[in-house]
Amino acid sequence: MAAIDGLPPLREVIRAHGLSAKKQLGQNFLLDLNLTAKIARLAGDLKGSDVLEVGPGPGGLTRGLLAEGARRVLAIEKDARCLPALAEVAAAWPGRLEVLNADALEVDVAARLTPPIRIVANLPYNVGTELLTRWLSSGWPPFWESLTLMFQKEVAERIVARPGSKAYGRLALLSQWRTEPKIVLTLPPEAFTPPPAIHSAVVHFTRLAGPRYPADAAVLSRVTAMAFNQRRKMLRSSLKGLAPDIETVLRDAGIEPTQRAEELSLEAFCALARRVAG
């Protein structure tokens, strides 16, 4: 990568700017430029696309995204200590990198980017799930074409989980309802500085033209939240606040009231959401 952008290795960048990952910000820096380049390639053809990156840190993945031909990268970094390192990346790629010192949860990113838009990020562990839920819950089709995101491996496994598995839950349902998520890369702790206690994984989400099964998004969100908040209870108990005669509602949707949330397929949850919505 240094041969492409003329910038030094990331370990030198971190040393030069006195950077260290902050646990309270969910930071773990990925320093291997071969890996950051691979993640950028796993996002697909970036030429002609604007790319949103959240939590760029010292800019390793940012460099990969620019080298892969992203038309423009918007990098949102909450930690002001990383800004000088990112400014060096911006200088190496004039006019193609905008760095925003802000909290990604508070930024209207769609208004700052031009379609087609792809989101590629090594997400800070403390906000990754919340950001994903927001991006999946927006109107459909969403403002983005695809998501390529790094999570803790345990979170990635929850995203692609199937009914009946221990990892299966609301995150799997929301992800699989309108996208095709796939784990495309697993990384060991030693790939990061400092090494986290767990493995990490990259998930690529291909958006679908529409939902797999019809349902109102708000109702489906409410039903799944109630069901999985008490996942070990029978649905007639966990969903009793959903309707006066919840057992009849469940049976009308083809669901046995004694079933538990982890046993229901996405199709069954959508059928229940339609029945609740009337």
UniProtKB/Swiss-Prot annotation:
The keyword RNA-binding applies. GO terms for molecular function: 16S rRNA (adenine(1518)-N(6)/adenine(1519)-N(6))-dimethyltransferase activity; RNA binding. Pfam families: RrnaAD (PF00398). The keyword rRNA processing applies. One of its GO terms (cellular component) is cytosol. Its EC number is 2.1.1.182. Keywords: Cytoplasm, Methyltransferase, RNA-binding, rRNA processing, S-adenosyl-L-methionine, Transferase. InterPro entries: KsgA/Erm, rRNA_Ade_diMease-like_C, rRNA_Ade_Mease_Trfase_CS, rRNA_Ade_methylase_Trfase_N, rRNA_adenine_dimethylase, SAM-dependent_MTases_sf. It is an enzyme of class 2 (transferase). It is found in: Cytoplasm. S-adenosyl-L-methionine binds at N28, L30, G55, E77, D103, N122. Its main location: cytoplasm. CDD domains: AdoMet_MTases. PANTHER family: DIMETHYLADENOSINE TRANSFERASE (PTHR11727), DIMETHYLADENOSINE TRANSFERASE-RELATED (PTHR11727:SF7). Belongs to the class I-like SAM-binding methyltransferase superfamily. rRNA adenine N(6)-methyltransferase family. RsmA subfamily. Specifically dimethylates two adjacent adenosines (A1518 and A1519) in the loop of a conserved hairpin near the 3'-end of 16S rRNA in the 30S particle. May play a critical role in biogenesis of 30S subunits. This is Ribosomal RNA small subunit methyltransferase A. It comes from Cereibacter sphaeroides (strain ATCC 17025 / ATH 2.4.3). The lineage of its organism: Bacteria, Pseudomonadati, Pseudomonadota, Alphaproteobacteria, Rhodobacterales.
